[in-house]
Amino acid sequence: LHRHLPTTDESDAELWALAVTGTSASDLCRKTTTWSTVAPVDALTLTGGYQYQVSGQTLHGKLFLAYKSAEDRLHVWDGTSLRRCGIAQPAAPTAADSGGGGTLSGTRYYRTREVELSGTVVLRRSEPSDTLTFAPDGSHASITVTKPASTGEGATHWELEASLDLNGDYYRIARTIVGTTTVADSVAYGTGYAVSGTLAEDVGDYEPIPSAKYLLVDEDRLICLGSFEDAALAARMAWTPVYNDTGVGNDERITLDPVSYKDLDTYEGGEITGGVGPVNGEIWIFKWSHIYKAVRTGVRTDAYDVIAISKSRGAIPGSMVEGVDQFGSPCVYFLDPRVGPCRIGSNGTVMRCGKDIFTTWQTVNLDAANVVARSLFYRAASQVHWFVATDDADAPDLRLVLHVEQTRDTQDGVRRGWAIWDGPSASALAVCRYADNVDANVARSLYLVPCVGLSTGATILRTDTGTDDNGTSYVAEAETKPHAPNTIMHTFGVVSGSVLGTATAGASVDLSIIRDFGLETITIAGVDFSPESGETQVMVPLDNMTMGELRTVAFRVADAEGGVSARWAVNQIALKQQPEQGA
């Protein structure tokens, strides 16, 4: 799933979805006001788990898609077709003497490029072909140069470049529509091509982007991480020129001069597993056990400084997400395979934030065959959602939810704020935030809610709506830690209590008082938070609640038995205690 912005108007957002049937079939679709199918120029590889490793990135109104196919190329939706980025290098041209009765002499060097034009504006250009060396026989007036077979990548014209020096400057001497396959060259050797030609661009300026695994955008350039095809590039960070740089099709090419890539320790620590950013001006790149920070330098010949931040922490693929901390400062969340949830704060410090759920984390199946994790940050609720596979599951079956506003920084890392969600919506192979009016065929709302694509059936769920989980009832509950008012050497009794909840019509809970780690439990059913006269908070007395000989007390709040009719919020529980004789 991906939310694509084809314009600067966010109400024009499109929802893109890829559905797969095992290893046999796939459907790539986009929704504007209706759903339509998109046919990629290169079919997705549906074996080896690659069908679950597709990622997208919006830039300049285009949707760049990183996926494995038979071609080692990045792909892009340009509004009309899903094609390969850039244009491949064509083959070398051929040439022959033509125009009898002349005296054209001197060895020439020819090469061709393919270009796409819109009117007179060049949109894309290929690298030059290999060079053809041709020596005219001296008895003809011209040389007829014939273009090679087309690359079939959307070129509208081809360019002929010529030089009198194999290793010298080349000049564009013709730009011709692809339907015309020949160009006649009658330039005298003594005149040369610099007089009437246009200096050609350098070799290495229009390298097509290979099949990267992960994509980011830094201001107006595309950043490509890893590779589906080449193990030597699995730890590579590469980037396109800035959009207003000289040249054309800048978001669809890689330059070799200046060098526009860096290899992050190559094989050490394995392949790149993803990246996030920029966050506070920094791009964060992860391997399974390494973390790197890249910072823009402003220097064209060395665009990024990259340093290793940690070689003992790393991230599971799909688990990295930008969010905010409890203070509202931008930060990065990720799942380290060993210790689970972690956070990189605004000061660049890596902190563990999953100690409170480490028992649950130990059930996560890092060897899941298809998908280990998916993640998103739900801004409206200040929540980080991770969908993970547990035990023997090969796809996510549990959702870990961190309520960031409830977290606290401690000497043990970031603590508190955790909830564990199961049910149908936890089984997500794909997630994104999208407009809450996705079902309406109107301009898209700017209120974005989590949408999940399930692991069974061609179903996309819009979450954070209603009081069930796609028709399945569930029980929401929260349990506090045990509290000891004095010490565990002293007992006390409970004679009465009260609970404070947000006023909501039809909202009710069952409240349990737990003595000494489960030694005894009293449950008060149907605590109702319906308002009586417009109050915003409801205080409900807890009558007939008597319990003695407690050393600790804990509380459990759960959906009232019989089903959920409204959402509830418990804000405070108070007990009146009766001291007893301590032991």
Role assignments for model-derived ranges:
Residues 22-25, 69-71, 79, 280-281, ...:
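Surface-exposed loop/turn positions within WD40 beta-propeller blades
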Residues 81-82, 300-306:
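A short alpha->loop->secondary-structure connector
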Residues 72, 121, 169, 231, ...:
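Flexible, glycine-rich phosphate/dinucleotide-binding loops
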Residues 1-38, 43-61, 117, 138-140, ...:
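Beta-sheet repeat architectures centered on beta-propellers
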Residues 35-233, 245-261, 582:
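Disordered, low-complexity "stalk" and linker segments at domain junctions of extracellular
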Residues 269-297, 301, 312-340:
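Beta-propeller domains
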Residues 1-41, 74, 86, 115-125, ...:
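N-terminal beta-propeller domains
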Residues 175, 308-312:
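Flexible gly/pro/ser-rich segments immediately N-terminal to CXXCH heme-c attachment motifs
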